Amino acid sequence: SMGFIFAAPIALKLNCAFVLARKGGKLPLDTVKAHFDLEYGTDSIEIQKDAIKQGDRILIVDDLIATGGTAKATGALVERLGGQIVSFAFLIELIGLGGANFIESDSIFSIIQY
């Protein structure tokens, strides 16, 4: 949920909608869910079913990319709902964990590579 503090002002600046992606069980109403692997198990992420429409252009923003599991699962949900991922943006990228390669996107931006 730390990505919210970056994503909300970016959405405001771009004059576009802000859609929440949260760990499973934290969003109200009907959601779609994707599961992903962690080093120590599995987890899930959800987006509300009506938050993204066919053809919406989506920038996925988070505070950190490590292994890329959360970002890849979020991207899968966006595409399942009909959205088009324009780019991924992160404050911090832990380059030794290879998350950017795991996502398999041509457009990944991070401010700090550590």
Question: Would you name each region that the model predicts?
Answer:
Residues 63, 68:
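Conserved G/P- and acidic residue-centered "switch" motifs that form tight phosphate/ATP-binding loops
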Residues 14-17, 83:
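A short helix-loop-beta submotif of the ANL/AMP-binding
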Residues 72-114:
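PRPP-dependent phosphoribosyltransferase catalytic core
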Residues 16-58:
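Short, glycine/charge-rich flexible loops or terminal/linker lids adjacent to PRPP-binding catalytic cores
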